[in-house]
Design a protein with these regions (language model features):
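Basic nucleic-acid-binding interfaces
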Residues: 2-162
């Protein structure tokens, strides 16, 4: 692998046979025998879009998600917990299957939230905190700022509604 760093623009050019990839140097991560840059914008909703993640539960969700990230060794780059859904911008290793990551986060978070707040089960008849679906979108260097602005805008939009 031939590497050339262009310090003027802070880009790294990686020549892999005939293909040339240009990636911002600060977004590259290194593993044993591989270089990667994998970020995802993840979104999932509460069951029935019930607005239950309020009154401090949003802060608890953030803390629990940070602990899960440390335990499972992925990075949360940005996070917004809305009353009825969660936005995450995550950076993970190529070995992670995104569907497994989401299952881990949703399952562990629901289990912990129901243990700490059993009253949630009454608000969400059926005993499920999350809708079974989710959205996972890859994020590039170019789209990262748009995703971050969108996530911040969601919080501002919610404040204006109330």
């Amino acid at each position: 692998m031939n590497e050339k760093v262009d310090s003027t623009f802070s880009f790294k050019h990686i020549n892999m046979e005939k293909d040339i990839f240009t990636i911002r140097e600060n977004t590259l991560s290194y593993g044993r025998g591989y270089v990667y840059s994998l970020q995802y914008h993840l979104v999932w909703c509460t069951k029935y879009r019930k607005k239950v993640l309020t009154d401090g539960l949003d802060t608890e969700c953030k803390e629990m998600l940070q602990k899960l990230a440390e335990e499972y060794r992925f990075q949360i780059l940005a996070m917004e917990v809305m009353p009825d859904h969660i936005h995450l911008l995550v950076d993970c290793k190529p070995q992670f299957f995104i569907s497994d990551m989401i299952k881990i986060m949703k399952g562990n978070l629901a289990r912990q939230m129901f243990l700490v707040h059993p009253e949630l089960k009454q608000k969400l008849w059926g005993g499920h905190l999350w809708n079974p679906s989710y959205c996972a979108v890859t994020v590039s260097d170019r789209s990262r700022e748009q995703v971050l602005a969108y996530m911040e805008g969601q919080k501002e939009k919610e404040k204006r509604r109330n």
